[in-house]
UniProtKB/Swiss-Prot annotation:
Stored CDD domains: cpn10
Gene: groES
Keyword tRNA-binding: no
UniProt-listed Gene3D superfamilies: GroES chaperonin (2.30.33.40)
Subunit: Heptamer of 7 subunits arranged in a ring. Interacts with the chaperonin GroEL.
Alphabetical UniProt keywords: Chaperone, Cytoplasm
A GO biological-process term: chaperone cofactor-dependent protein refolding
Source species: Mycoplasma genitalium (strain ATCC 33530 / DSM 19775 / NCTC 10195 / G37) (Mycoplasmoides genitalium)
A Pfam family that the UniProt record links to this protein: Cpn10
Location relative to the cell: Cytoplasm
Protein name as annotated: Co-chaperonin GroES
Length: 110
């Protein structure tokens, strides 16, 4: 896919799962959605990061997460689209609420 986010936007591949998950530190995340076609639309794997500042800002964002990390973001943020059967979303940096590193053994791309 040749989509590159601009400014402080983040391109994510949506994670599909309809179950509660428990992190290694015991945090329970319920990812079920009322609309099963868009389940877990608030969790995704980072595919690409925008390289510039948002409109009206002079500093580039300092991302604490990178390509390959899993992020959680506001439910109604950004735009959703499909490409070759996969679901993606482009969201603003300020809509990212939390992130986690991939499980050990899975390498993160930079």
């Amino acid at each position: 896919m040749n989509i590159t986010p601009i400014h402080d936007n983040v391109l994510v591949s949506l994670v599909e799962s309809n179950k509660e998950e428990v992190s290694k530190k015991g945090i329970i995340t319920s990812l079920a959605s009322n609309d099963k076609s868009d389940a877990n639309a608030n969790k995704g794997i980072v595919i690409a990061l925008g390289a510039g500042p948002a409109y009206g800002k002079t500093e580039k964002p300092k991302y604490a997460f990178g390509v390959g990390d899993i992020i959680y973001f506001k439910e109604y943020s950004g735009i959703s689209f499909e490409n070759e059967g996969n679901k993606y979303k482009i969201i603003g940096f300020e809509d990212v609420l939390a992130f986690e590193k991939p499980e050990s053994g899975k390498q993160r791309k930079r």
